[in-house]
Amino acid sequence: MHYIIDGYNVINSNDMFIASTLEGRRNKLIEFISVNRPHGSLRNSVTVVFDCKSKNPYESDGYNKSHYGSIEIIFSDGVVSADDIIAEIADNAKNPYEIIIVTNDKGIRRRTAPSGAKHESVEIFLSKGFKPKNAERASEAASIGVKEEINEEFEKLWLKKRSEK
C-alpha cells in the first residue's frame, strides 16, 4: 500500500501537532509517522504532501521532494497545489487500488475517487498510530536510541582508560 498524506490537512486536524512554528508542526507529523507507523507494515510506503505558497527561486523546476528515512516529503512549487500533486499521484498510479489518501478534504476525495484510490480520514489514520503494537514499536525505537547512547558513552570511557595506560 502507498499512503498519500495531505500534510496540512492532518496537522490542522489535531492538537498533537501544535508547535510554535509551521516547521515544528510539520516535523511533529513526520516524527509521528516515523515512530508510530500508522501506515502499518514497513512494506507500505508513505508520501506526505505540503503546499508551498511561493516558489523558492533557488529550487529547480517542479515541486521539491525530499526524504526523512523512508518517508517521502513533497512541497508543491507555488504554482501547482498539494491537491494537484495528490491527484496526479493517484491518477498516474499503476495500481490505484493500492493507494490510500489520508485527508478530511472532501474536494480531494471527490477529485481522486475516479482513480480508484481509497480514502482514509485523518482520525482513523492517527488512531492507528496509537495501537498497542505501534506503541511497542515506538518504545523499541526509543530504547534502541538509548542503547546506542549508552554504548557510545561506554566506548568513550573505555577509549579514555586505554589511552591513559
Task: Outline where the language-model segments fall.
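Nuclease catalytic cores that cleave nucleic-acid phosphodiester bonds
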Residues: 2-5, 9-165
